[in-house]
Design a protein with these regions (language model features):
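Short active-site-proximal "capping" loops at secondary-structure junctions
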Residues: 45-50, 83-84
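Phosphate-coordination/substrate-recognition cap region in phosphate-metabolizing enzymes
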Residues: 64, 68
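Short loop/turn segments at strand-loop or loop-helix junctions that form parts
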Residues: 10, 43-46
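Short, flexible/disordered intra-domain loops and linkers
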Residues: 18-22, 49-61
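Active-site regions of metal-assisted phosphoester/phosphodiester hydrolases
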Residues: 1-39, 70-71, 75-254
């Protein structure tokens, strides 16, 4: 029985470095594989782009999702949010365990910025109730984020049983640090880094993190360990640091 889960969240910046200068997906996959996470929450996954597939010789023929999952994460889910003539990008989940159901909800607050909430139910061996894993990437403007957070809390209330183990992770763009209060009051969740270290992690920019934009919110778990993966090497990988957490399921959780 898997009482302990290792999870990661990472905004991969569409698989390229700043200003689309270099292709970074191979470095990103190598880093993810070394972490050996059970479930990975990804944002800005560009699964198709006609121009980049021609420009970058190493662009995977199978698409970014299948390339990242490889053999380590046999199950994956992709939520297409933003579409354009050359392709599309969105949120994604990689899982070592079977994903039994996935829904991508549209939580866009404005026509100019498409956003989604990717919700997957995962069968973890030995658990009698699925893990609910939700990946989000919220908007750049506070007004839009407020609307999106309301959508997220309402959707979770409708689609996630109150007793179910729940993880919400991703890029919240939450400059005002309001998400934690909203999730605590409405969903009974807490942020992993805040519980373990007192404050959410600094995750942006990755080479010298200052802003606390990326989060991991949990319900039904103890937080055993958290870590920010950042530093100079991330200049060639992504503008966001990667966050990981080791979570232990609460014994009396169904």
């Amino acid at each position: 029985m898997h009482n302990t889960l290792r999870i990661a969240t990472f905004n991969i910046h569409k698989g390229v470095t700043h200003f689309n200068a270099r292709f970074a997906l191979h470095h990103q996959r190598d880093l993810l594989r070394r972490l050996q996470a059970d479930v990975v929450f990804l944002q800005e996954v560009r699964d198709e782009h006609a121009e980049h597939s021609k420009r970058f010789a190493a662009w995977p023929e199978t698409g970014q999702m299948e390339y990242l999952s490889n053999a380590l994460w046999p199950d994956y889910a992709y939520g297409k949010n933003s579409t354009y003539p050359a392709g599309h990008h969105g949120n994604a989940l990689l899982s070592k365990f079977p994903i039994i159901k996935t829904t991508n909800f549209d939580i866009s607050a404005h026509a100019s910025e498409q956003r989604g909430m990717l919700h997957s139910e995962i069968n973890v061996p030995g658990w009698d109730i699925p893990l609910h894993a939700i990946c989000v990437h919220l908007g750049l403007f506070a007004k839009w984020r407020r609307e999106q957070l309301l959508s997220v809390t309402n959707l979770i209330a409708q689609h996630v049983p109150a007793e179910a183990p729940l993880i919400i992770a991703g890029d919240f763009n939450d400059w005002g640090m309001r998400t934690g209060r909203i999730f605590a009051e409405n969903l009974g969740m807490h942020e992993a880094f805040e519980q373990h270290a007192g404050k959410p992690a600094r995750s942006f920019p990755s080479w010298l993190p200052i802003l606390r934009l990326d989060r991991i919110y949990v319900r039904g778990f103890h937080v055993k360990h958290v870590e920010v993966h950042s530093g100079a090497k991330f200049v060639k990988i992504s503008d966001h640091a990667m966050l990981t957490a080791i979570l232990t399921r609460v014994p009396n959780s169904p």
